[in-house]
Amino acid sequence: LTPSMSARIIIDHVQDGVALARENNLPRPLVDVIEQHHGTSLAYFFYRKALQYRDEILSRVESGLASPDDVPEVVESNFRYKGPNPQSKETGIVSLADIVESATRSMGKISCEEMQKRVDELLKQRVVDGHLDDCGLTFGDLKKIRNSFIKTLKSIHHNRIAYPSHNPEAKIEK
């Protein structure tokens, strides 16, 4: 799939979720969470992939290996969710939890410092992008949310000891 097609599939999950929620008569506040949790944020991974692909084609054009007609147009708005941005504190928190969980999970095994840095980057990115402007969260709220996320992520990502497999037939030496 092209980056544009991949982005469309990912972005469409919001409207698919809203339709499913309405079909099942979920309460309006839950429909709002589904509809608003990505706001108008950028599907950055696929946008970046589209820009890289465009740059590769441009290089091929410069080398005479491709036609200028082959260069795809990359329009940022095509890689943005349709919104609206979160309209309540609860929806703002869900949207932050969604991005923090998916981003930290994709990082694999990380240190506490790396995790904290990534959480801080993600929260800052959402604030700067205006994603939280309409939901009523304060900077004090964001500090509490950040601390809660980090505490939760630490408990999820902490190292665990490797337990031996359980074999009831094995004799235990005394």
Where are the language model's segments positioned?
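Membrane-proximal, non-transmembrane interface segments of integral membrane proteins
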Residues: 6-7
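Cytosolic, membrane-proximal regulatory domains of ion/volume homeostasis and mechanosensation machinery
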Residues: 1-3
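Terminal helices and disordered tails flanking the catalytic cores of nucleotide-processing hydrolases
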Residues: 10-174
